[in-house]
């Protein structure tokens, strides 16, 4: 079971600038009597009633700079707008509102099984940005995708397909520069033997595989529950490096992410990539 406590933070975490989205709860002021809690100002019969007691204020864009916390929401509204500012780090002290935030307590309250929804907890650090992914980024990944394709998503056949692929192709493709003359010669040889694959095309060909992983705001935060399509019997968690990129293409930050992939679905057809990835 995932446990996030003070040991989840490296000792030097205060030495830098960090971006977070934090669910910040707040109290709902009793604008109307407790037994008639219609939305203030709405006199229509049957108007929607908010739940009684505390209500969440929603996600906040939070900056952590040199160990201090700042709320960037009043200045920018969203993390996306903040990262597209001219100087996102410089804006922290100029425009951020200093707040008292115990990051260790927020971390401890973040896993779904230990969460108190009336206390702050971490969300995914992005909001309005498109979530893109790069596939077949190294040799092992490329060979695994070829294996998926050759066993047609059948996990029981994966071991035999893996041995077959490695015997024929080998593991030394890392020395080949994608799109080079050597790569094109290898492609011709593989095509002649009937071993060419769309995954090899993006692995050693001229163009990389870059696709939309999911829609904005579909990502979930640390320790949150994830959804896996019930039709899949072979899914993989994939720890990956994630980059925060602004609209000008500048890399502003890095984090770790979990790219859950339905291997049996993707192995049936590359045209099912969206179904295999967006889950």
Predicted regions and their residues:
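Active-site microenvironments in enzyme catalytic cores
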Residues: 2-24, 36-37, 54, 90-279
């Amino acid at each position: 079971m995932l446990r996030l406590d003070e040991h989840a933070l490296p000792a030097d975490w205060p030495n830098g600038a960090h971006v977070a989205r934090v669910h910040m709860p707040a109290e709902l002021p009793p604008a109307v009597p407790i037994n008639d809690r219609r939305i203030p100002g709405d006199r229509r019969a049957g108007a929607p009633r908010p739940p009684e007691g505390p209500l969440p204020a929603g996600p906040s864009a939070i900056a952590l700079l040199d160990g201090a916390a700042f709320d960037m929401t009043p200045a920018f509204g969203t993390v996306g707008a903040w990262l597209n500012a001219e100087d996102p780090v410089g804006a922290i002290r100029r425009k951020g509102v200093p707040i008292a935030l115990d990051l260790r307590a927020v971390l401890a309250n973040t896993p779904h099984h230990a969460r108190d929804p009336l206390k702050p907890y971490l969300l995914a650090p992005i909001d309005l940005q498109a979530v893109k992914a790069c596939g077949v980024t190294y040799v092992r990944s490329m060979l695994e995708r070829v294996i998926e394709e050759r066993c047609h998503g059948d996990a029981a056949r994966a071991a035999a397909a893996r041995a077959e692929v490695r015997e024929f192709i080998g593991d030394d493709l890392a020395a080949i520069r994608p799109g080079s003359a050597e790569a094109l010669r290898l492609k011709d040889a593989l095509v002649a033997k009937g071993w060419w694959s769309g995954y090899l095309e993006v692995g050693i060909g001229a163009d990389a595989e870059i696709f939309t992983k999911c829609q904005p705001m579909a990502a979930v935060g640390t320790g949150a529950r994830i959804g896996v399509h019930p039709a899949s019997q072979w899914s993989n968690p994939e720890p990956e490096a994630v980059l925060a990129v602004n609209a000008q293409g500048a890399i502003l930050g890095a984090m770790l992410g979990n790219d859950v992939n339905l291997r049996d679905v993707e192995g049936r057809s590359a045209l099912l990539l969206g179904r295999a990835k967006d889950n």
